Amino acid sequence: MNTVLSPIEARIIGCLIEKEVTTPDHYPLTLNSLTTACNQKSNREPVLSLSESDVLDAVDGLIGRRMVSDESSFNSRVNKYQHRFCNTEFGDLQFTEQERAIICCMLLRGAQTPGELRTRTGRLANFSDVKEVESILEKLVAREAGALVVKLPREAGKRESRYQHLLSGEVDIEAFATASVSAVSSSASSEKFEELESEVASLREEVAELKALVESLL
């Protein structure tokens, strides 16, 4: 299975996995329901505004790669779609409930810390604590058939490192590190500027007080 997904394909697969677990009575999804799921504002990063045409084009591509199937009946007026991405009879990717939850959440929101993943996978799987999330992540990193997740450099000022899925291809670790340094540098520059502004304001107040004192003595 060719598992390199475009951003839209990743969103579609993530939504289908999510809805299979959280709303089984309404799964498989119609094109309208799938588009709504892709564009919803909660538990999505970034928030998208895809048209049904955008989603259908991506779904057709995923059907061609056997990652999605059309489950509508012969006489059905509405097509319904389900994923074949993981945990299927003949599929390459077989996940535990916890692994599936983490992968799903990453497909929907990108890079996240173990703490964020534990909070955001509440409807998909149970984790006793953050350490259990970290343990599952390390299994996905060290997977014998090939890593599905990578640990990113810890951002300055952050307690936890983020993890990113590799289902959309290799991650440029240096780019993430550079972006982190740039963000910290920008923040530091902003703080320095604010400090200088505060110092200037204080000096102006002192000058005004001295002028008033001099004038009172004349």
Swiss-Prot record:
Domain of life: Bacteria
Annotated SUPFAM superfamilies: Winged helix' DNA-binding domain
A Pfam family that the UniProt record links to this protein: DUF480
InterPro entries in the cross-refs: DUF480, WH-like_DNA-bd_sf, WH_DNA-bd_sf
Database matches in PANTHER family: UPF0502 PROTEIN YCEH (PTHR38768:SF1)
The family this protein is said to belong to: Belongs to the UPF0502 family.
Protein name from the UniProt record: UPF0502 protein VS_II0353
